[in-house]
Amino acid sequence: MDLQKVLPQMILLLLFLNLSPLGGHSHPLGSPSQSPEQSTMQKLLELIREKSEEMAQRQLSKDQGPTKELLKRVLRSQDSAFRIQERLRNSKMAHSSSCFGQKIDRIGAVSRLGCDGLRLF
């Protein structure tokens, strides 16, 4: 190895090691203890978090009451819609049993297949 090439590299390495922090960790410029402003900010942040959690719990408890009422209303409206559909189906079936527009030459009153012979309700 050539001493002229190795010597500058060794000097740079020693200079770099001398300037690097101990243990390879950075050292902050401020003191390790918290400042009074920082501790008050931490307390305020904790208070805000607690208040927001309390408000969320209150809102959740308030929302559950109207949700039950809303669910009951929706079920009632669905039930009434179902009843209306049933009435429409029944009325259509009753109208389809009429004799309007059909020939009834061979259907007699004894067989109960003529007009008003078969009633669904």
UniProtKB/Swiss-Prot annotation:
It holds the Pfam family ANP. The keyword Secreted applies. Residues 1-26 form the signal peptide. InterPro entries: Natr_peptide, Natr_peptide_CS, Natriuretic_peptide, Natriuretic_peptide_brain. One of its GO terms (cellular component) is protein-containing complex. The precursor molecule is proteolytically cleaved by the endoprotease Furin to produce brain natriuretic peptide 45. May undergo further proteolytic cleavage by various proteases such as DPP4, MME and possibly FAP, to give rise to a variety of shorter peptides. May be cleaved at Ser-91 by the prolyl endopeptidase FAP (seprase) activity (in vitro). May be degraded by IDE. During IDE degradation, the resulting products initially increase the activation of NPR1 and can also stimulate NPR2 to produce cGMP before the fragments are completely degraded and inactivated by IDE (in vitro). The record marks R76, S77, S91, K92 as: Cleavage. One of its GO terms (molecular function) is hormone receptor binding. Induction: Up-regulated in cardiocytes in response to stretching for 48hr. Induced by lipopolysaccharides. GO terms for biological process: blood vessel diameter maintenance; cardiac muscle hypertrophy in response to stress; cell growth involved in cardiac muscle cell development; cellular response to mechanical stimulus; cGMP biosynthetic process; cGMP-mediated signaling; coronary vasculature development; endothelial cell proliferation. It comes from the Eukaryota. Keywords: Disulfide bond, Hormone, Secreted, Signal, Vasoactive. Expressed in the atria and ventricles, but at much lower levels than NPPA. Expression levels in the ventricles are slightly higher than in the atria. Very low levels of expression detected in the brain, hypothalamus, lung and aorta. Disulfide bonds join C99-C115. Belongs to the natriuretic peptide family. This is Natriuretic peptides B.
